[in-house]
Amino acid sequence: MKRKRLFLLASLLPMFALAGNKWNTTLPGGNMQFQGVIIAETCRIEAGDKQMTVNMGQISSNRFHAVGEDSAPVPFVIHLRECSTVVSERVGVAFHGVADGKNPDVLSVGEGPGIATNIGVALFDDEGNLVPINRPPANWKRLYSGSTSLHFIAKYRATGRRVTGGIANAQAWFSLTYQ
């Protein structure tokens, strides 16, 4: 019996002796990289121009007689404020959005019931040059200290032979590149 108690005590003693110890184990986990860019101060986009709506109006589908024919121009302006020419002297604008299936340079007005067909929205700079969507800026405008206004034109453009009536809304977002 004494032997059994001694054996039981000898087997339980190491567990009680180690119960208060905590063992920390450090294993290799991996590498981390932190990446980013700190940009110099550029222009501030006027608040109302960040969520702009350009009213294209109502246009008869009979007005379009050929592929590539445009509607009357609808001007719009992106206002830049608090610009510094110390950082950059020129700015380029790129427009991005869903391209029309027949003409990748213009914005799609969508598909489905009630949507106009064979029509897209084409964007132009203030000199009348087409600004193809989803491409880097091709035309650069001079920046002025303080405020700079960037003038553009939107036009409906026939992308097929027969334009049909319906909703003709397109959506785009723009990015600014400074040089």
UniProtKB/Swiss-Prot annotation:
Keywords recorded for this protein, A-Z: Disulfide bond, Fimbrium, Signal
InterPro entries to which the protein is assigned, alphabetical: Adhesion_dom_fimbrial, Adhesion_dom_fimbrial_sf, Adhesion_dom_sf, Bact_Fimbrial_Adh_Pro
PANTHER family: FIMBRIAL SUBUNIT ELFA-RELATED, FIMBRIN-LIKE PROTEIN FIMI-RELATED
Protein's organism: Escherichia coli (strain K12)
Disulfide bond is among the record's keywords: yes
Upper taxonomic lineage: Bacteria, Pseudomonadati, Pseudomonadota, Gammaproteobacteria, Enterobacterales
GO cellular component: pilus
GO biological process, one term: cell adhesion involved in single-species biofilm formation
Disulphides: 43-83
Pfam families the record matches: Fimbrial
Protein name: Fimbrin-like protein FimI
Record family assignment: Belongs to the fimbrial protein family.
Signal sequence residues: 1-19
Compartments (UniProt record): Fimbrium
